[in-house]
């Protein structure tokens, strides 16, 4: 276990129950802008999930996509806030969810796990994968 993950658990275990309970899980929320939209496809997202899960030591389970693949042209999404790919990668301890917006060159990523993980590694890898020029990050301890 990396040092920062061990520190997260150690701090949680030392907190008296009357103050803040030990976290149930951890959620990293990443809002990425100025992305390379060529990374917004099933093949690229498969690669992202594999690399991310390996980097933060999570076991991949089922994965699902929601996009316009196989949808007739006249039924495909055309609005900037809906045209893109969404994917859910279930992991043994919860999930990684990605929503991409092709026309806005934006990606929204949620990484949630009952197990602690290195959020700095996850953020760096995600920002690099999507080639984002900007990344807004929120980290939540779920109790």
Task: Label each region the model flagged.
Residues 1-143:
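Polybasic/polar functional segments that serve as interface/processing modules
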């Amino acid at each position: 276990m990396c040092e920062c993950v061990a520190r997260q658990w150690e701090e949680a275990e030392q907190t008296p129950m009357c103050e803040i309970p030990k976290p149930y899980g951890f959620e990293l929320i990443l809002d990425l802008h100025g992305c390379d939209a060529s990374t917004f496809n099933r093949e690229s997202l498969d690669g992202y999930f594999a690399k991310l899960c390996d980097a933060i030591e999570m076991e991949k389970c089922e994965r699902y996509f929601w996009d316009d693949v196989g949808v007739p042209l006249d039924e495909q999404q055309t609005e900037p806030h809906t045209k893109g790919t969404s994917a859910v990668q279930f992991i043994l301890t919860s999930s990684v969810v990605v929503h991409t917006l092709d026309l806005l060159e934006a990606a929204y990523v949620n990484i949630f796990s009952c197990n602690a993980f290195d959020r700095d590694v996850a953020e760096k890898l995600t920002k690099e994968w999507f080639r984002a020029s900007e990344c807004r990050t929120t980290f939540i301890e779920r109790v």
